[in-house]
A protein has these predicted regions:
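N-terminal auxiliary segments of SAM/dcSAM-dependent transferases
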Residues: 1-26
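The AdoMet/dcAdoMet-binding core of the Class I SAM-like
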Residues: 38-170, 176-179, 187
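A short, aromatic/hydrophobic, helix- or strand-capping loop or linear motif
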Residues: 182
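A SAM-dependent methyltransferase catalytic signature shared across enzymes that methylate proteins
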Residues: 185-191
Length: 191
């Protein structure tokens, strides 16, 4: 059952579906995520916080809300005095989580540690003060390869990576979800 859909800036259609208590999000008919297949999103949140000192008041940027599984893992890991800037490009996806997905993960948006921001994460990173975040966790598009929206390639280009690392505190961590290995992206990360 289609619960909702919205248009993206490039004219594509993002749709939310429910079937027998399971949810999925598709872009122009291609399934991007499913509530039964959430291990990689949870692992992303876990890896984003791994090896951080977790002393006090961590500041975490989560780019991309989707069905909320990365946010769920981050919230279950960080301290009570931490803050998460949850940045989602499409305001409708935030609304879907609050309304249609409230029982799945939408309740997470009510957590006082979460600030939901409807904005392009690329802009959020550009506008960030230097050394603002302890962790930056990105599940944007399909990662550096197989992108749904070509405009997202600037996030994974050298200038985008420089912005990410500028916004990261010393000892912090950037973790990026990717649909598969990308040797070019790996080389850019090493520069």
């Amino acid at each position: 059952i289609k619960l909702a859909d919205t248009k993206t800036a490039d004219g594509g259609t993002l749709s939310l579906f429910e079937q027998d208590g399971d949810y999925s999000i598709s872009f122009d008919g291609q399934e991007l995520m499913h509530s039964r297949l959430n291990a990689s999103e949870k692992l992303l949140g876990e890896l984003g916080l791994a090896r951080l000192k977790m002393q006090s008041s961590e500041r975490v940027l989560v780019g991309g809300l989707g069905l909320g599984f990365t946010l769920q893992r981050v919230l279950s890991t960080i301290r009570k005095d931490s803050q998460i800037d949850l940045v989602e490009l499409l305001p409708d996806v935030i609304d879907w989580n609050r309304n249609h997905l409230s029982k799945l993960n939408g309740y997470l948006l009510k957590d006082a540690r979460v600030k939901a921001i409807a904005q392009d994460v690329i802009q959020t990173i550009r506008d960030a003060e230097p050394e603002k975040y302890d962790a930056i966790i990105l599940d944007v598009d399909n990662g550096p390869i197989a992108m749904v929206s070509p405009g997202n390639d600037s996030l994974y280009a050298q200038a985008g990576l420089s912005g990410l690392f500028r916004a990261l505190r010393p000892g912090g961590r950037v973790v990026v979800w990717s649909a598969g290995p990308d040797k070019g992206f790996e080389k850019r990360l090493k520069r």
